Every structure is written in structure tokens, then in C-alpha cells.
Amino acid sequence: MADKYIVEEAEALAKRALHSPIAQATPIYEQLLSLYPTSARFWKQYVEAQMAVNNDDATKQIFSRCLLTCLQVPLWQCYIRFIRKVYDKKGAEGQEETTKAFEFMLNYIGTDIASGPIWTEYIAFLKSLPALNLNEDLHRKTALRKVYHRAILTPTHHVEQLWKDYENFENTVNRQLAKGLVNEYQPKFNSARAVYRERKKYIEEIDWNMLAVPPTGTSKEETQWVAWKKFLSFEKGNPQRIDTASSTKRIIYAYEQCLMCLYHYPDVWYDYAEWHVKSGSTDAAIKVFQRALKAIPDSEMLKYAFAEMEESRGAIQSAKKLYENILGASTNSLAHIQYLRFLRRAEGVEAARKYFLDARKSPSCTYHVYIAFATMAFCIDKEPKVAHNIFEEGLKLYMSEPVYILKYADFLTRLNDDRNIRALFERALSTLPVEDSAEVWKRFIQFEQTYGDLASILKVEQRMKEALSGKGEEGSSPPESSLQDVVSRYSYMDLWPCTSNDLDHLARQELLVKNLNKKAGKTNLPHVPAAIGSVASSSKVVYPDTSQMVVQDPTKKSEFASSANPVAASASNTFPSTVTATATHGSASTFDEIPKTTPPALVAFLANLPIVDGPTPNVDVVLSICLQSDFPTGQTVKQSFAAKGNPPSQNDPSGPTRGVSQRLPRDRRATKRKDSDRQEEDDTATVQSQPLPTDVFRLRQMRKARGIATSSQTPTGSTSYGSAFSGELSGSTG
């Protein structure tokens, strides 16, 4: 719908019509005004084109179509020019028609802040009327005084100039009476001038040339919407403290002007109609709703609001027609439900029941209709048996809908029918897909916590864990019981058996365990190339165990961070791209939870890693290996090196393995290689018969034992100098 409302194309068409002959311009204007019927600028351009060729009949027809819906001063000035052109040469009859036209115009737009020139023109026209005798002169002066009084009470741009003209007028007529009249109207003028200054602030924020298009959420549209809301609120406050009739007139004028720009905004139409209802003018509200549905025919909101107003004032047949109109335009479950409720209110139970029997046969009927009618029968008609039968009938069709199961369970709970509730849960959980059964399991547990004993509660919880643990991957074992289960079991509404800090701690632990178990066993270390391919093609990314992180102070730049480390550099280079890919292709919810447990110091450290040119490993594979590795603690490392000598420096890029080998004598290293050769066959058999170790150092020894001869002849391998996430050194060759 919004595709046809292209402002740039409309402006281009208007410009083309402006320079085209009237025969070619007319269809262009008609096309424009069919899309933008409240554009006073396009109407003015159209009518001026007809006036230029003296096509008076077409001009009158155009004015009859636009004047009352486009309350803008330039368009109405064009109207008064046309009237004066037609009637100026018709003598007294023409003067009378012109006077009526001025009064008609000021009755509609006389409260506009830009209407000052119209007041001035009207006063000048009255002064120009001939006075053949004293009575006519007196009548003319009385008419002028009345117009002046109306003009100086209107907060317009020309209010001060009109006040000066009024003072001169009174002094010219009668100096003795002038002082009394001027003093009487001075406070009223001061009030109008003060209101004008405030009014001007709101008017200046409004773009009067804005074309009415359906809302698209642009900043300009929102700004204009806010500006109009402020202006309407200002006018509703009656800042000038004028009488109710005059204030109502100004508010109506403000709403009509607002609709020229916000013609496709249903909230503006609704506010306008509601204001009429609160003001006691229901007939005016009906007209507003009728215009609104003509402007936005697809708005169900406005149709429901209109039907509600008609029903509230007792116009049942009018409301029924509106509901039937909704059903005819878009037959959906919501329309069925709302019509059911209306029939129940307006015509009784039997009418609603009869319609339900027809509605359930409709292709657009869903489980919502069954729930709504069953609830209506139970709550309003006090017929639990009827409601139970409706739920049972719907269960045959919607057993696979978790929401329907839960609503049925709620109904049985209100009946205190615990036997049928258990039967319902068992029936539903035996047929529901695992991925759709989580909420039903939770409700089953809540039910057991209320109606069952401890054994039944624990049994259902265990069944839920076993059922839901297998929905992700085959062979996964059900999660073990945790303190989180106890908290869930013994909490009630917003009451918890622990503090908020305990809850946060348990939540973090649950997240870490979830991340650890999620990918445990998926990466097959002897087949690293296959693992690389699977990680690259999958949107599920393995994340590190953040609980074992070593806090890094970013203010202290160590040699490890500053060294030309290809692995660390690759982590620095690929980490943002990995993050972006994860957030784009999936697992966004899991990834969003990781930064919550990442220390700020580590984030700063990763951001400051230098960029190094060279080959970069796949970060996902490196992290998956590190995640499954059982790194020795600091105390274990110290004890290990205490037996062999001083531990190597953490700043040594060669790692602990290289540091030890450099301090061993040559013959010791040779002996070590011979021992490895002699045990190669035994080690190979042992490795093949045992599961792969999770220790990266043991894995390195296994690979070294397998390929020591090849690696000694052809130096191919890789060395990992540490994990950018843990801060510990590791080495591997193979």
C-alpha cells in the first residue's frame, strides 16, 4: 500500500502538470488528488489552473470538493479571489454575495494563526461599501466594529496591527466613546497577544507542506506527529479562557488541520472521535469514524472502535453491521471471537452458540475460537459441562498445540479436577513433539507442586529432564540435579528461598555448565580437518570456559602480548569476524550471554592484541581444543618444575616444553628419543585401544610417538604459544 505513496514522484507530477495545458494537466491532478486528497497545495494549483482559463464551472466544482477538508489559508484566499472576480461587477447583489463568502470563510478558518490578511481584506471590503445615507453609514460602522472585535480576539500574526487599526477606527468614529471601548477590549487583546506568542512556538514546528502518507516510522514523521500532539494539547487547554463554543471551534479546526498531514494515522482519527464523544457530540463522532474508515478502510482497530461506540449508545444494528463488515473483509479467528462476544452481549447465549457451530466449520477457525467460546460458557453462562465438552472436542483437533493444552489445564484447575489434569498432561506429552513440550512440562511440574506429593514432583522433574535432554542431540544424557532445581521447586510467585546474589551466581553457573556440555564430545581431535569443515559450515560456535580465565591487566603490556605471535594475532584478527558471523547466522542468544561472564580486562586485552601478517588458524577449532583440554593448575606446574628445576619464564615464547629440552644434556635427549623409538609399537597399540585423552600435553606426546621419525626428517608442525583466552602456554607438534 505504501509503495504508491512516493512523495518525490508526486512532486514531479505536480511540477509537470503546472507547465502543461489544462486538458493534459487535469488527469494528472486527478491522479495526484486521489492519492493525496488533503493536499491543499495540489488543490490550489489545480483550481488556479482552471481559473487561468476562466473555467468557472470546473472551478466551483473543485472548490466544493476541497474547501471543507483542506482548511488552509492560501487555498481559501484563492476561493475569495474567485468569488470577488465573479461578483464584483454585479452591484448590490454581488456585494451581498461577497459579504456572505467572507463570513463563510472566516467561520471556518478565521481562527487560523495566518488568517490576519483575510481579516484585513474583509475590513477593507466593508469600508469600501458605499453608504447612501446616514443609516447605511451607521450600519456599515457597526458591522466594522463587530469584525474588529472578532479579529483582535483571534491570536494571529497580525493581531497587533489589527489592534492599531481598531484604535484608529474608534477614534475616527467618536473620540469620546473610543476611550471606553478601547479600555474594555484592551485586556482581551493582551490575552490574545500572549496566546499568539505561545501558539506561534507550536505552529513553527509543523511542516504545513507535508504530504499525507501512511506512517513508515521515519524520524520526520515522528517529529511531525509529536508536534501535532503538542499543538492539539495546547488548544484543548483553552489558554485564552474563551467561551466553550469558541474553544470547541478552535479544537475542531486544529484536528481538521492535523488530519491534512496525518490523514493515514488511525490514532489521530480515534482521538478526534473520542474527543467528540467526551464533548457530548456523538453525531459528530459518528461522522469522524465514517471519514476515518473511508481514509483507512483496512483498519480493523477503527472498525472495532466504531462498533464499540455504536454499541455503547444502544445502536445494536449499526454495531452488528460493522462486525459483519469486519468478517466480510478479513475472516480470521479474532473476527470470529469478537463477533461471538458481541452476539453474547447483544442477543444472548443462543445466538452466540449458533454462530459458534457455524464458525468452527470455517477454514479460518483455529483453536483460539474453541478456547474463547469455552471460556465464555464457563465464566459468563456458568455452564462448566458445556465448556468441558467444547474443550474435549477441540482437543481432537488441536492436541499438537501447547497453548491449547495449557488453557485446557487452566480450565480443569479451576474445576479442581486433578485427575483429569494428570490425564490431560500424560495424553499431551505422549503426542507433542519434544521441541514444543517444554512449557507443558513446566506446567505439569507446577501442577504437581500444588496437588502432588514430593515423590510425584521429583518423578515428573526427572521425566522432564530425560525428555528434554534428548531434543538436541542423540546420545546426550539427562542433566544432573542442581541447586537450581531446589530453588525452582521451593519458590512461590516472587518469593525465593535465596538472595538475588545467589540467583545471579546460580544463573552464571548454569550458563557455564551449559556452554561446557553443549559441545562436549563433538570435536574429534584425530580428524582436525573434518572438525574445521564442520565448524565453518555450522552456525554453532564453541565458546571457551570463561570460568578458568586469568585476569589480564591491560595497563601492563607483557612481552607475550607484544611478541610477534601468529596464534595470538590470528585470534585478535579473527575474533571480531567470528563474533559477527555468530550474531548474523545464529546462536545469537548464546553469544549474547558470553560477554556477561567475560572480565572487562580480558576484553581490553583482546582488543589491544597486535595485528600480525601471516597464516592464521581457525579460531573456533583452537577454542574447541582448549575447551576440552584439562590444563594443569598453577600449583601443579610449580610442583612439576620444582622436581626438574626452575620453571621457564612465562615470557619465553618457546613454552615450557622447549625450555626443559634446552636444559637437558645432549646424551639425555638422545636417550629419550631412543626410548621413544623402542616404545613406539606399544604406545600405538595402547593409544588405539584407549579413548583419546583430553589433556593437550598427553595428546602431543601421542602424536609425537606416532610421527617422531617423519617429523625428525621433515620439520612440519605447528606450535601453539598459548591461549589468548586462558593466558596459559601450550605446545603441540604433529
From Swiss-Prot:
Role noted for this protein: One of the multiple factors required for polyadenylation and 3'-end cleavage of pre-mRNAs. Required for the targeted 3' processing of antisense transcripts that triggers transcriptional silencing of the corresponding sense gene.
Q: Which SUPFAM superfamilies match?
A: TPR-like
State whether it acts alone or in a complex, and with which partners, per the record. Answer: Homodimer. Belongs to the CSTF complex. Forms a complex with cleavage and polyadenylation specificity factor (CPSF) subunits CPSF30, CSTF64, PCFS1, PCFS5 and FIPS5.
- Record's Gene Ontology CC terms? nucleus
Where it sits in the cell: the answer is: Nucleus
Q: Where is this region: Disordered?
A: 637-734
The record's HAT repeats, renumbered to this chain, cover 20-52, 54-85, 93-128, 139-172, 198-237, 246-278, 280-312, 314-345, 347-379, 382-414, 416-450, 474-505
**Keyword Nucleus annotated:** yes
> What does the UniProt keyword field contain?
mRNA processing, Nucleus, Repeat, RNA-mediated gene silencing
Q: What is this protein called?
A: Cleavage stimulation factor subunit 77
What are the recorded Gene Ontology BP terms?
antisense RNA metabolic process; embryo sac development; mRNA 3'-end processing; negative regulation of DNA-templated transcription; post-transcriptional gene silencing; regulatory ncRNA-mediated gene silencing; RNA 3'-end processing
Knockout: what is the outcome? Impaired antisense-RNA-mediated gene silencing (e.g. suppression of overexpression of FCA-mediated FLC repression). Delayed flowering and female gametophytic lethality.
Where composition is biased (Polar residues), the residues are 709-734
Q: Where is the composition biased (Basic and acidic residues)?
A: 664-677
Q: Which GO terms describe its molecular function?
A: mRNA binding
Question: What InterPro entries does the record tag this protein with?
Answer: HAT, Rna14-like, Suf, TPR-like_helical_dom_sf, TPR_rpt
Its main localization is nucleus
